[in-house]
Amino acid sequence: MRELSINNNSKLFALLLNIYNPKENFEITKNYFKSENPSDLIHSAQKTDCDILALRFNVLSLDELPKAVSLLRALLPYITKPLMICGTGKKEIDEKLLPELMKVLDREQCIISFATENTYKSILPSVIAGNHYVVLKTPIDINLAKELNILSVDMGLSLDKIIMNTDIGGLGYGYEYGYSMMEKVKLESPKDDYLSFPIISDASVESLKTKEARFDNFPDSWGELLKRAEMIELSSCAGAIAAGANIVVVNNPESIKFLRELV
């Protein structure tokens, strides 16, 4: 099992898989793996060049928690890459789901993604007890990011277990604001202990949600849809790297080889 070390100099790539409901993976993910079986996905992902394997448990309701926990327990023996556990992004689910998933983890130093100002009180106790990293996600605002970092440390979270997600849009102004926010944090971090943390970017996830990456009703000059989506992922990730992201989430393993040449 590989050790995970994350700091402000890290340049790591996390491969994201919607493992609970693989049908929700982006087309560029489906096209690469050509399977929607969780075991097959894990087996294939282990052979990729990703530094971190990010598994998203995209349950629809609290009734599905036992099934999600059972799935993680069944997959853990086959996972040797550093692991990131991702929730749904919905407060009422994640504050229950993530602690339950952490109970069955058979290793320390996993990344738990993510806690917000609305969920950190429910999620952090399990993070601390399991000696895991946690992604603290805030809207695009440096003061809110710093505040959540301080509140988390006050709860007992070690400084070296914090990873920041300062949020970003998928396209246009939202992407530009998110890019500028990462730059600002990196500029301020040398003189502020509560901003001096690694940053994770899921810009590719947001970019692949846009209509430009999902629909084929564009002029021929835009190119074939699948190739266009691949280029959108590469472009969004390249910008995040330039802005200073230490961990970049990708959905297509083939993106990693190209992106490594940028760091």
Each model region followed by its residue ranges:
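Acidic (Asp/Glu)-rich catalytic clusters
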Residues: 42-49, 72-79, 99-106, 121-130, ...
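Active-site mouth loops of central-metabolism enzymes
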Residues: 9-40, 62-63, 87-91, 111-114, ...
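Glycine-rich, proline-tolerant flexible connector loops at the mouths of alpha/beta enzymes
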Residues: 24-29, 46-81, 85-92, 258-259
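Short, acidic/polar
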Residues: 34-46, 94-98, 231-237
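Catalytic alpha/beta core domains of metabolic enzymes, predominantly
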Residues: 118-262
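Short, well-ordered coil/turn segments that N-cap beta-strands
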Residues: 9-13, 49-51, 79-83, 106-110, ...
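An N-cap/entry alpha-helix motif that binds or orients negatively charged groups
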Residues: 1-6
